[in-house]
Structure formats: C-alpha cells, structure tokens
C-alpha cells in the first residue's frame, strides 16, 4: 500500500507577490471613519476585489501527488550472529530427534525457563515482504518472537493479523497444524475443536497496578475484549476479539517480561466455568453466525427481513389489508399466508381474502355454493348454514347385529343324542 503526499505547486505558494497594505493605521481609524453609504460602498468594493483574487488563485493552483511505497520489513537480528545453542539440561536422557532432555523432574521445566533473547516491535519491525504478493500467506513465527533475520525477503507476513485474515480452523495463523485436544500443560498450537481467544498469563510480578501493566503490554498485539487479573496469585486472563491475534500474542509474549525481570508463562486458557461467561460466548457465536449469513444474503433481502425496507412495509400495508381500509395484519398472519403461497408455487398471488368462504366441517359442504347473504340479521346466511352444519354433520354408526346362534347345523359322531 502506498502513502500519498500532496504538494502545492501554485505560483502564489512558490513566489510571494508583493502586496500593498491598504489597511489604515490606528491614527487614521480615529480620524476617518466611514459611515452610511460610504461604508457600504467601501465594503462592497473590498468584497469584489477578494472574490477576483480567489478566482485567479484557484485557476493557477495545481497539486502534485507523490506516491511513496510502504517501507520494507527490516531484519530483526543479524544473520551472522545466529548460532544454534544446545538446550539447557533439564533431565537425564537427551533425545536427538526432538532436541530435548527427558527424565527430569516435572516441576523443573518451569524453574529452568530462560528469558527470550529478543522481542518484536510492531512499530519498528513491521513492513512488506514477499508474502504480501501471495494471497493466503501465513504469518512469520520468528517475526512474532523477534528473531527473524530475513526482513523483506521473508516468505511470511511481517505484520499483525486483522479481521480479514481468515485461515482454516485446523491450522493457526502461522500455518502449524492443530490437534484434536490440548496438551496437558495447555501449551503448543492448540485444538481445532473449539475457538479459543483467551490466554493464561502466569508468573507475573505482583504490584498494585498489575492490571494496567498487563493491559498495556498485551494491547500491542491486537484488540482486547476483556482482561481479568488475579492480583494475589500473579495470574491474568487476556481475551482478544480475534483468535489470530491471540495466537500471535501467545508466541510474542512467551518467556517475555513486563515491567520487571519476570519470565512469563503464557498458555491457552481452559473453558471458563462461569455460566455468564458461557452464555456470553454462545451469544457471541450466534452474532458471528448471523453476521456471516447477513453478508452472504443480498442487502435488499436482509433489509426486508429486519424490517428496514420501506418498500416492503408499503407492500405489506397494501397487499395485506385483506380489502379492509386501515387494517394492518400482524406478522404471524402475514408470514403464514406468505408461506402458504410459497408452498403452492403461486408467486403472483396477493394476500387477499379467498373468494369462497372456508367451511368449518364437511357437513356444511352440502350447502348451496351461490347463496345470497341476507343483510337483515347480525349473521349472514352462509354463517348460519355453517353453524347448522355443525349439528347435522355428526353421524352415528350402529354396530352390526350379532347372530343369536350358529348359522348351520353340524353332525356329531356321538349317537347318544
């Protein structure tokens, strides 16, 4: 992205024209004071001269636009100073495949942590790289840790993630594969089973302004949703609005220090057991899904669903009046009728009352179809016929009469009748 600078190259700006000061001095103002018609004529002449001068300066004024390219990303460390150091001995057996020690005490791994050699500075280190020309590029892991020696020649992005940087849920913003479950120490890449935006920050030096210190250091890596600090235990929970920013902040603040010389322990946070937090997370996911659906649908359709389309309101008021002036049907009746029309496939049908009255029972179907309604009573003749059909439509069925004896005689082999 290029920066734009505007330079005024008009002749008036380049060379100052000599001007005559016609403003009267203080002494002259006391002696000569225009009044009445003389004052009006003098004011009109000054206004006319000013308008002519502004018109001439507008015609001669030109602008020259200079486009400056974005600055390239700078190398964070000198490549000549890079050297591979063996890891500190924390166990009894060295694994050459994983370059780790094993067999040591489990609690020693937190006490033997070494401070990070460098820290990323977004304002100074960020810039364009080769990855900016490739769509879908991942972010540089070594840039987040502050030890990338390649600078603008790096194949990964050297900047902060934004809301427009979307990746598959099975990888993080650095392109590393996620797992189905978290590690026992809640470290590493994380899990793809749920979207985690909260970091656990431990081993913080306890002070009175610990919340302000944590918010100031972690706000550098993205927009923070909320921060919860346990002052007595030196523990903080930082929640970002974007998951990619949480992944970037986890790698950027690992083994770093705040205002003191502590070594932070940054891990993924477990699920918050607070019911209010779970409801808040569920509501956020619903809003995110609704926003995704809203972006996928046309703007006119979304406006009609949300009741912000004036044409839809006007059409509803006209077509849904059912022939009654001033009547506006409720939403339930409107959507039920619309769903019925969609099921029949009649797109041009309007929401009007049916021509034939609907019968309540099947017994009323025997009434004549073209009855003339009488206007002498309260109810119409069709309504009276429908009410009569309620009583006459009930049909009772009698059971078949049972035979009193066998239908045919039968013979017996026994002769003792």
Curated annotation (Swiss-Prot):
Keyword Lyase: no
Biased composition (Polar residues): 40-57
Entry keyword set: Cell cycle, Metal-binding, mRNA processing, mRNA splicing, Nucleus, RNA-binding, Spliceosome, Zinc, Zinc-finger
Compartment(s): Nucleus
Keyword Nucleus among UniProt keywords: yes
InterPro entries named in the record: Cwc2/Slt11, Cwc2_RRM, Nucleotide-bd_a/b_plait_sf, RBD_domain_sf, RRM_dom, Torus, Znf_CCCH, Znf_CCCH_sf
Biological-process GO terms, alphabetical: mRNA cis splicing, via spliceosome; positive regulation of cell cycle; positive regulation of RNA splicing; spliceosomal snRNP assembly
One Gene Ontology term, aspect cellular component: U2-type catalytic step 1 spliceosome
CDD domains reported for this sequence: RRM_cwf2
Biased composition regions of type Basic residues, renumbered to the chain: 60-73
Record domain RRM: where: 197-271
GO molecular function: pre-mRNA binding; U6 snRNA binding; zinc ion binding
Positions of C3H1-type zinc fingers: 134-161
Region (Disordered), start-end ranges: 1-89, 391-417
Function: Involved in the first step of pre-mRNA splicing. Required for cell growth and cell cycle control. Plays a role in the levels of the U1, U4, U5 and U6 snRNAs and the maintenance of the U4/U6 snRNA complex. May provide the link between the 'nineteen complex' NTC spliceosome protein complex and the spliceosome through the U6 snRNA. Associates predominantly with U6 snRNAs in assembled active spliceosomes. Binds directly to the internal stem-loop (ISL) domain of the U6 snRNA and to the pre-mRNA intron near the 5' splice site during the activation and catalytic phases of the spliceosome cycle.
Record's comment describing the protein's domains: The C-terminal RRM domain and the zinc finger motif are necessary for RNA-binding.
Subunit structure: Associated with the spliceosome.
Family statement: Belongs to the RRM CWC2 family.
Descriptive protein name: Pre-mRNA-splicing factor cwc2
Naturally occurring in which organism (per UniProt): Emericella nidulans (strain FGSC A4 / ATCC 38163 / CBS 112.46 / NRRL 194 / M139) (Aspergillus nidulans)
Source organism phylogeny: Eukaryota, Fungi, Dikarya, Ascomycota, Pezizomycotina
């Amino acid at each position: 992205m290029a920066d734009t600078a505007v330079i005024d190259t008009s002749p008036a700006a380049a060379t100052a024209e000599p001007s005559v000061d016609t403003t009267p001095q203080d002494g002259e103002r006391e002696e000569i004071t225009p009044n009445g018609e003389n004052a009006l004529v003098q004011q009109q002449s000054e206004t006319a001269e000013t308008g002519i001068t502004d018109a001439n300066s507008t015609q001669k004024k030109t602008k020259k636009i200079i486009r400056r390219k974005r600055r390239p990303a700078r190398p964070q460390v000198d490549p000549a100073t890079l050297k591979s150091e063996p890891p500190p001995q924390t166990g009894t057996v060295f694994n050459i495949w994983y370059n780790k020690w094993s067999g040591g005490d489990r609690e020693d791994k937190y006490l033997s942590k070494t401070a990070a050699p460098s820290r990323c500075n977004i304002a100074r280190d960020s810039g364009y790289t080769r990855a900016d020309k490739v769509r879908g590029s991942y972010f540089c892991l070594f840039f987040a840790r502050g030890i990338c020696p390649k600078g603008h020649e790096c194949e990964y992005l050297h900047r902060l993630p934004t809301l427009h940087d979307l990746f598959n849920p099975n990888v993080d913003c650095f392109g590393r594969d996620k797992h189905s479950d978290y590690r026992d120490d809640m470290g590493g890449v994380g899990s793809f089973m749920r979207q985690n935006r909260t970091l656990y920050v431990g081993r913080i030096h306890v002070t009175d302004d610990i919340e302000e210190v944590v918010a100031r250091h972690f706000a550098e890596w993205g927009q923070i949703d909320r921060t919860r600090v346990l002052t007595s235990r030196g523990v903080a929970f930082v929640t970002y609005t974007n998951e990619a920013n949480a992944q970037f902040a986890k790698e950027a603040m690992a083994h770093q220090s705040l205002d003191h010389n502590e070594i932070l322990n940054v891990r993924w946070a477990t699920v918050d057991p607070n019911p209010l937090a779970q409801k808040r997370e569920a509501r956020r996911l619903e809003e995110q899904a609704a926003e995704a659906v809203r972006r996928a649908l046309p703007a006119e359709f979304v406006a009609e669903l949300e009741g912000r389309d004036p044409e839809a309101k006007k059409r509803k008021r006209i077509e849904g009046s059912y022939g009654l002036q001033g009547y506006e049907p409720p939403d339930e009746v409107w959507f039920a009728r619309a769903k019925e029309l969609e099921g029949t496939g009649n797109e041009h049908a309007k929401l009007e009352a049916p021509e034939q009255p609907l019968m309540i029972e099947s017994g009323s179907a025997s009434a004549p179809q073209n009855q003339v309604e009488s206007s002498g009573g309260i109810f119409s003749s069709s309504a009276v016929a429908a009410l009569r059909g309620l009583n006459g439509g009930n049909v009772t069925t009698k059971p078949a009469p049972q035979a009193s004896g066998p239908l045919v005689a039968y013979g017996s082999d026994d002769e003792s009748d």
